[in-house]
């Protein structure tokens, strides 16, 4: 439904979300960024704005970095829909996107951004499920549970083992052939 999609894209950050975004902009790993890409969702732009202002950067908006279209989970008929979307890359809810579809569009956007910005430090602001599905291109899903805790590994090393939180920061390191050689979840100072 187009109206639902537009409403979803216009969701704004909470006051806490704004504070977390400002703290995130001070994260050491996010300094000296050359180029920034975001989805076209308002809350993603709001998360990026502090980094953009501090580093005097312009934003590049690409809707391919948008969150997965959730559709209608229909948990009455499919009570395990949340776990199923991780274990079956082609599963999708009515009107929603599958893991494979999200990964495809995220991968196309990522590869284009990397190709167009060779040798630059790139920050991409996207969304929890979309990023997770994208990371599954290289990571192994070790587990997911009904509490929405995820465990991901890369090259037999656990890189994420908790619930996706907004924002979460993942660093993807590429070699000179643009092959992924490392993935890590960057912890940052938070409100606690």
Regions found by a protein language model. Give the residues of each.
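Glycine-rich phosphate-binding loop signature in dinucleotide/nucleotide-binding domains
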Residues: 29-32, 113-120
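Acidic, low-complexity terminal tails and accessory targeting/binding regions
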Residues: 60-61, 67-79, 118, 136-192
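Active-site-proximal alpha-helix that buttresses catalytic centers in soluble enzyme cores
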Residues: 1-57
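Short glycine/proline- and charge-enriched loop/turn segments
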Residues: 2-9, 83-86, 151-152
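Phosphate-handling substructures
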Residues: 11-12, 53-108, 160-164
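Short catalytic/ligand-binding loop motif for oxyanion handling, primarily in non-cytosolic enzymes
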Residues: 1-2, 44-47, 69-71, 131-134
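Beta-strand elements within well-structured catalytic alpha/beta cores of enzymes
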Residues: 37, 117-126, 130
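A generic secondary-structure signal
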Residues: 23-27, 108-113
């Amino acid at each position: 439904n187009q109206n639902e999609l537009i409403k979803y894209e216009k969701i704004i950050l909470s006051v806490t979300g704004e504070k977390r975004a400002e703290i995130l902009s001070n994260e050491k790993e996010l300094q000296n960024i050359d180029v920034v890409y975001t989805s076209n969702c308002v809350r993603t732009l709001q998360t990026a704005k502090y980094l953009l202002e501090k580093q005097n950067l312009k934003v590049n908006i690409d809707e391919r970095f948008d969150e997965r279209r959730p559709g209608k989970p229909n948990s009455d008929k499919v009570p395990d829909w949340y776990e199923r979307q991780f274990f079956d890359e082609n599963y999708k809810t009515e009107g929603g996107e599958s893991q494979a579809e999200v990964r495809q569009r995220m991968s196309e956007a990522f590869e284009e951004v990397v190709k167009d910005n060779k040798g630059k430090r790139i920050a991409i602001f996207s969304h929890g499920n979309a990023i997770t599905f994208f990371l599954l291109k290289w990571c192994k899903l070790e587990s997911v549970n009904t509490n929405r805790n995820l465990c991901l590994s890369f090259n037999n090393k656990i890189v994420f083992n908790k619930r996706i939180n907004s924002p979460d920061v993942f660093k993807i390191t590429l070699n000179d052939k643009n092959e992924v050689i490392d993935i890590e979840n960057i912890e940052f100072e938070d409100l606690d």
